[in-house]
Regions:
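Core catalytic alpha/beta fold that binds nucleotide/phospho-ligands
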Residues: 1-242
Length: 242
């Protein structure tokens, strides 16, 4: 297991390599700046030049990187990946960080599904506050997600090939295609004097996906007039987070 500084170097190097797949800039040319609460973004000149938005998250051995060709749209993008830890006592946390409607919906589920829903909601909430750039300065109880009308789809995840990276293993460049569970049509509401008030039309789009039984990811996009389209690629950087 590498220390935090080494892991951070790998993540930054990988981010630069991936961004260079989307624009004619070499990995060492990318320049970043940070929002008031620390959200990373491209410097203004490169944002205007490339039209790219990005956000990233990591958990365990997984790194999730979201990249969007936003063009001139002023959008907010946030992603999160979460591990459903069996050691977490979820119930004391509910009333501190979840909206009343989220708590009620979770507790109405069979007990064997409540832990999964907890981490589903946590991933969604993290993706939203990361999109806004407010981080934990925004109360997690001040907004809530509703999965009661979520639609299940499948999202193909293909193996990315041709990455010019020392971490990439060409030996795994086979016809691998995974079908991920993906949920769309997730509602988002905001607290209004102690109750949840639904905002219509909702300027936010969120989706929830599962990599496997233990890991799920969420993507939240704000400010776009177009439906969110996802293209999932699996990149195998040897020892990136090990």
């Amino acid at each position: 297991m590498q220390d935090a500084r080494t892991r951070a170097l790998y993540v930054r190097g990988f981010l630069r390599a991936i961004l260079s797949r989307y624009a004619p800039l070499s990995p060492d040319e990318w320049r970043f700046e940070y929002g008031e609460k620390g959200k990373p973004r491209l410097c203004a000149e490169q944002r205007d030049q490339t039209g790219l938005e990005f956000n990233l998250s990591h958990s365990g051995d997984y790194l999730l990187l979201g990249v969007m060709r936003a063009g001139s749209e002023n959008v907010e993008l946030g992603v999160d990946i979460e591990h459903a830890r069996t050691s977490t006592d979820i119930y004391p946390i509910l009333n501190h960080y979840f909206s009343p409607q989220e708590v009620t919906a979770l507790l109405n589920l069979p007990e064997n599904r409540q832990r999964q829903r907890f981490f589903d909601l946590w991933a969604l909430k993290e993706s939203y506050i990361k999109a806004t750039g407010q981080g934990l300065a925004k109360s997690l109880k001040s907004f809530g997600f509703d999965l009661s009308e979520a639609r299940e789809e499948t999202l193909p995840m293909r193996l990315a090939t041709g990455l010019d990276s020392p971490f990439y293993s060409e030996s795994v460049a086979s016809e691998l295609e995974l079908e991920l569970e993906l949920y769309r049509g997730i509602g988002l509401s905001f607290a209004d004097n102690g109750s949840d008030k639904k905002v219509e039309p909702n300027p936010w789009q969120s989706c929830l996906g599962r990599l496997n039984e233990e890991y799920r990811f969420a993507v939240t996009l704000g400010g776009s007039v177009k439906p969110m389209a996802l293209d999932a690629r699996l990149v195998c950087p040897n020892n990136l987070l090990r």
